[in-house]
């Protein structure tokens, strides 16, 4: 068995090692935002935020359960720092979220500042609901 396929128990859930590692990277990034906010400093994302973007997509089904919504396939298309393009999910999905990777990452880690206007566009009912979910603040 490949180690990335091994299951771990985490917060009463079983997750694979890859998802666990990506989750820990996302958590570290999110807490870095908290520190910058406390110091009233701006945080500039780098291409390493791709791991946080992947976390958001990998965690979409769990976020749906927490918000008592029926999960549907979700396509994510993002432009990251240095104009890197990142896509996750089936191209044929009826639900998609497109836009700035920084906004996506802040949504999925529960770090959208009050009054911040998101630059994400949505297509499909599930995608519209997803960006408004109460995402777990990791």
Predicted feature locations:
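Short, small-residue-biased leader/transition segments that mark boundaries at the very start
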Residues: 1-3
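Phosphate-handling catalytic interfaces
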Residues: 7
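Short, solvent-exposed polar/charged micro-motifs at secondary-structure junctions
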Residues: 18-19, 83-88, 128-130
């Amino acid at each position: 068995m490949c180690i990335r396929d091994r299951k771990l128990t985490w917060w009463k859930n079983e997750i694979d090692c890859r998802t666990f590692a990506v989750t820990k990277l996302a958590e570290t990034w999110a807490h870095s935002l908290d520190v910058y906010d406390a110091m009233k400093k701006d945080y500039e994302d780098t291409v390493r935020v791709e791991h946080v973007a992947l976390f958001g997509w990998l965690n979409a089904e769990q976020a749906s359960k927490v918000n008592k919504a029926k999960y549907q396939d979700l396509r994510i298309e993002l432009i990251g720092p240095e104009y890197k393009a990142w896509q996750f999910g089936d191209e044929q999905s009826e639900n998609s979220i497109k836009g700035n990777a920084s906004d996506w990452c802040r949504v999925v880690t529960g770090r959208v500042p009050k009054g911040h206007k998101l630059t994400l566009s949505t297509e499909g009912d599930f995608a519209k609901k997803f960006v408004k979910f109460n995402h777990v603040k990791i």
